[in-house]
From Swiss-Prot:
Primary gene name: bpt
Stated role: Functions in the N-end rule pathway of protein degradation where it conjugates Leu from its aminoacyl-tRNA to the N-termini of proteins containing an N-terminal aspartate or glutamate.
Top-tier EC class: transferase
GO molecular function: arginyl-tRNA--protein transferase activity; leucyl-tRNA--protein transferase activity
Protein name: Aspartate/glutamate leucyltransferase
Main location: cytoplasm
Catalytic activity: N-terminal L-glutamyl-[protein] + L-leucyl-tRNA(Leu) = N-terminal L-leucyl-L-glutamyl-[protein] + tRNA(Leu) + H(+); N-terminal L-aspartyl-[protein] + L-leucyl-tRNA(Leu) = N-terminal L-leucyl-L-aspartyl-[protein] + tRNA(Leu) + H(+)
Length: 238
C-alpha cells in the first residue's frame, strides 16, 4: 500500500492467531501496520477502510472463521440524539467539560480505578501506567483528551484522535461510582458535539460486535454506517 502524501510503501503484516478477547471460543488474527512513515493524513484514509489505532500501531481484524467485528461510524451532520440521550445530556448539565492535549496523573488514576472496578475480568487487568501509555499514546498522532468535571473532580475522560476529516474514539473511562450519570454515553455525545464544532464529517467508534454485550452499545447512536464488503452502508434499523 502507498501513501499519496509521500509515495512511501507501507508494509502490512499479519499477526499470529490467538484467542479472541471479545468472543469466547473464537480465534483472532490482525493485519498490523507499525511504520515510522505513518502520519495523520494516511491514518484518516486507513480509518475509512476499517483500521484502528492502538498505541503507535494500526490494526484491522482478519480472523480465520469470524467477521463479527464491524467498523462503525457516525455521519456527524446527520446525527440526532435519541430521547434517552437527550435525557443524559440534561441530567449532566451540572458538569463541565474541556479539551486538552495534556496527560495528567488524575487521568491515569481514574483509568486505574475504572479498570479495577469495571474490567477486572478482562485483558486490561491489572492496569499499569506502562500498559496505559502503550495503549493510548502515539508518537505521530498525540491524542486529545475530553475531560468531564464535577467542580474540580475529574469524572470521565474520552481519548480521541483528531484527523482532518474525522474524529476517532480511542477509549473512554469514567468514575464507576457515578453509574447513574451514564457517563459512557455522555462521552460519546460530547465527541459528537466536538466533531460538529470542528466541522468533521465522521466520528469513528471502532468495532461493533453484536454478540458481545459490552461492545453492542454503539448501535444506539443513529444514524450510523457499517463497513461492509460493498463499502460503508447505512443501518436499516429503525
Amino acid at each position: 500500500m502507498n501513501s499519496n502524501a509521500s509515495n512511501t510503501p507501507i508494509a502490512i503484516g499479519i499477526s499470529q492467531i490467538f484467542p479472541c478477547s471479545y468472543l469466547d471460543g473464537q480465534q483472532e488474527q490482525l493485519l498490523v501496520i507499525q511504520e515510522e512513515t505513518l502520519d495523520p493524513i494516511l491514518f484518516d484514509r486507513l480509518l475509512a477502510i476499517g483500521f484502528r489505532r492502538s498505541g503507535s500501531a494500526i490494526y484491522k481484524p482478519r480472523c480465520p472463521r469470524c467477521s463479527a467485528c464491524q467498523p462503525i461510524r457516525l455521519p456527524i451532520k446527520e446525527f440526532t440524539p435519541s430521547k434517552r440521550q437527550k435525557r443524559t445530556l440534561a441530567h449532566n448539565r451540572d458538569l463541565t467539560w474541556r479539551i486538552t492535549s495534556e496527560h495528567t496523573e488524575a487521568q491515569y488514576a481514574l483509568y486505574e480505578k475504572y479498570i479495577r472496578e469495571r474490567h477486572f475480568d478482562g485483558p486490561m487487568f491489572p492496569p499499569s501506567k506502562t500498559q496505559y501509555e502503550q495503549f493510548l499514546f502515539c508518537h505521530w498522532l498525540p491524542p486529545t483528551f475530553i475531560e468531564v468535571y464535577d467542580g474540580n473532580r475529574l469524572l470521565a475522560v474520552a481519548v480521541t484522535d483528531t484527523l482532518s476529516n474525522s474524529l476517532s474514539a480511542i477509549y473512554s473511562y469514567f468514575d464507576p461510582d457515578e453509574e447513574r450519570r451514564s457517563l459512557g454515553s455522555l462521552l460519546i455525545l460530547l465527541q459528537c458535539r466536538l466533531a460538529k464544532l470542528q466541522d468533521k464529517e465522521f466520528l469513528y467508534l471502532g468495532y461493533q460486535i453484536d454478540a458481545n454485550r459490552k461492545m453492542s452499545y454503539k448501535r444506539l447512536y443513529r444514524p450510523y454506517q457499517i463497513l461492509t464488503p460493498q463499502g460503508w452502508e447505512y443501518s436499516q434499523v429503525c
